[in-house]
Structure formats: C-alpha cells, structure tokens
C-alpha cells in the first residue's frame, strides 16, 4: 500500500499529487476545521473556488481549490480515482505531459464551475481527475492502445465516469467541474492520440 505514496520511475507525479492533497486535508484537520466535513467558510478562507471572489482578481483559486476537499469521503474517493487512472496513464505519457494535462484540465474545470454556478463554494481534485479520465477515454475510443488493454479499461472508465456524473445530480457535487474536466481532457486526448499511438508503436 505504501508504494503508492512513494514517487518512483514511471510513477512519479501521481504519488506527489496524492501526497499534496492529503497534506492539505491533514493541515485543515489539525487546524481544527473538522474531519468528516469542512464548513464552506473555512474552505473559502483556504482557497476554494467561489465566483464572486475568483473573478474579482483572486484567479489563483482556480488552481488552489483542486488541492482541497470538503471532507474525508470526498478526498478518499478522489484519491482512489486518481490512483486508478494514474497507474496506467502516467507511465504512458511521461511526467511532463501527465502533469500538464492534470493541471490544465483542473483549471478548465474550475472555469466551468464559475461559469455555471454564481455562488457555490467549490473544492476538489475531481475536475482534474475527470480530465485524466476524459483523456483516457479518448485514447481508448481511438484505439491508441492494444485491443486487449483497451477493452478492459474502456468499460471500467465508462462505469467510473457514468457513476460519478449520476452522483452529481444528487446535490452537493460540482458536476460543472466534472463535465468541464471530462470534456477538456477528451479534447486534449483527441489532439494527442495520433502522436501517442506513434510513440507506443516505436517503443514496442
């Protein structure tokens, strides 16, 4: 279990991202803001995305909110989702492309959130994680990977994405960020698929 938290060759960025998210969560717990869940006011003070303040010059919130979570179950679910996709995507993409896709889709997901919601305090890595799944989905649909690999993970990816989007309609979940991350990741996947396929064929 501990190996998933230790950066190593081919799996370097994902453990760092998981550790950063956990450190922010632990810091908020130590600060006395809660454990099972945090109040919106405290999240806002720590860097949550909130349209009235974000568009008023605090654009850094588009990034900082992606390293924060609303409570225990929120961070556990997101880190599991990040671990699952990161294990397969990071070795294929390499550190630079992987982190670039993660941060880009995370920020675009935050933009989608403030475009859709006028006064919602939003936090979580799920927009960026959905971005990775969107990218993964595009590459699977375009058959970038070998058939046996693609079939196995296309089903699990569709189940993960579908389940989480449906859960978003139950309330309290930022589906705008999920959809924004998913679409932006999918588009990036479409753009990069040809190059990635050539890279995989060369490395065989």
Which functions belong to the PLM regions below?
Residues 1-16, 20-22, 162-204:
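C-terminal transmembrane module of polytopic alpha-helical membrane proteins
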Residues 10-123, 170-173:
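N-terminal TM1-TM2 helical hairpin plus the immediately adjacent luminal interfacial "cap"
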Residues 13-14, 152-156:
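Select subsegments of transmembrane alpha-helices in polytopic membrane proteins
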Residues 29, 106-110, 114, 132-135, ...:
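Transmembrane alpha-helical segments of multi-pass membrane transport proteins and ion-pumping complexes
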Residues 75-82, 123-135, 173-193:
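Alpha-helical transmembrane segments that form the membrane-embedded catalytic/substrate-binding core
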Residues 91-95, 138-154, 194-203:
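Alpha-helical transmembrane bundle and helix-membrane interface signal
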Residues 102-105, 156-161:
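Central hydrophobic cores of alpha-helical transmembrane segments
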Residues 119-121, 125-150:
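Alpha-helical transmembrane segments of multi-pass integral membrane proteins
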């Amino acid at each position: 279990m501990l190996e998933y938290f230790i950066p190593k060759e081919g799996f370097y960025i994902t453990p760092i991202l998981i550790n950063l998210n956990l450190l922010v969560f632990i810091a908020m717990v130590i600060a006395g803001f809660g454990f099972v869940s945090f109040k919106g006011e405290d999240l806002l003070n720590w860097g949550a995305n909130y349209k009235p303040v974000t568009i008023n010059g605090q654009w850094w919130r588009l990034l900082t909110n992606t390293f924060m979570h609303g409570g225990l179950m929120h961070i556990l679910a997101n880190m599991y989702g990040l671990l699952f996709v990161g294990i397969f995507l990071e070795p294929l993409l390499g550190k630079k492309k992987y982190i670039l896709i993660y941060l880009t889709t995370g920020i675009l997901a935050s933009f989608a959130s403030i475009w859709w919601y006028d006064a919602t305090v939003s936090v979580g890595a799920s927009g960026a994680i959905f971005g990775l799944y969107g990218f993964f989905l595009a590459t699977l649909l375009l058959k970038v990977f070998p058939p046996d690999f693609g079939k196995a993970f296309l089903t699990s990816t569709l189940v993960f994405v579908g389940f989480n989007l449906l859960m978003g309609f139950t309330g309290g979940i930022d589906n705008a960020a999920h959809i924004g991350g998913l679409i932006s990741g999918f588009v990036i996947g479409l753009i990069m698929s040809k190059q990635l396929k050539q890279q995989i064929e060369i490395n065989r």
